[in-house]
């Protein structure tokens, strides 16, 4: 029960911070999620605009720190990720309710998009490092992307 209480407290703190600070970093998630929600129903979404929103959201949540390979790239490196998460096959993930997380389709789609993003970033990270990096792409980065674009998973940090 302690873990659940911690989760509830963290969510409450996040919510209170977002409401108390008009231009606080907590709002960057809200802006990112909103533009992706609108884009899901747009027959021709502006991928460049969405990539910029995603990049700023990721930067405001620490994913563009000095040790991050993303810091060496501009926001357009996220274009293929944006195109991927907007595919109709991931509609079942968008804002998924907790009760639906056990559905096999939801689990399959979540696993697929997670590993597709990881596979995309792997070679980019290797190129920035100038060598093959043995470790996997950060789950924190991938889950922050999924949280900001689909709202289907909390960030694992």
Each language-model region and where it sits:
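An N-terminal alpha-helical hairpin/helix-loop-helix interaction module that forms a charged
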Residues: 1-134, 152-155
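Helix-hairpin-helix
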Residues: 127-147
């Amino acid at each position: 029960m302690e873990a659940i209480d911690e989760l509830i407290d963290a969510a409450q703190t996040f919510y209170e911070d977002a409401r108390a600070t008009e231009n606080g970093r907590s709002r960057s998630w809200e802006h990112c999620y909103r533009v992706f929600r609108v884009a899901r129903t747009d027959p021709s979404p502006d991928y460049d605009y969405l990539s910029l929103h995603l990049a700023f959201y990721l930067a405001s949540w620490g994913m563009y720190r000095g040790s991050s390979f993303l810091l060496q790239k501009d926001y357009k490196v996220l274009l293929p990720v944006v195109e991927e998460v907007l595919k109709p096959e991931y509609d079942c993930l968008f804002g998924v309710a907790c009760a639906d997380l056990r559905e096999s389709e939801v689990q399959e789609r979540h696993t697929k998009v997670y590993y597709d993003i990881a596979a995309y970033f792997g070679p980019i990270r290797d190129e920035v490092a100038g060598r093959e990096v043995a470790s996997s792409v950060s789950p924190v980065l991938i889950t922050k992307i999924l949280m900001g674009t689909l709202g289907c998973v909390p960030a694992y940090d």
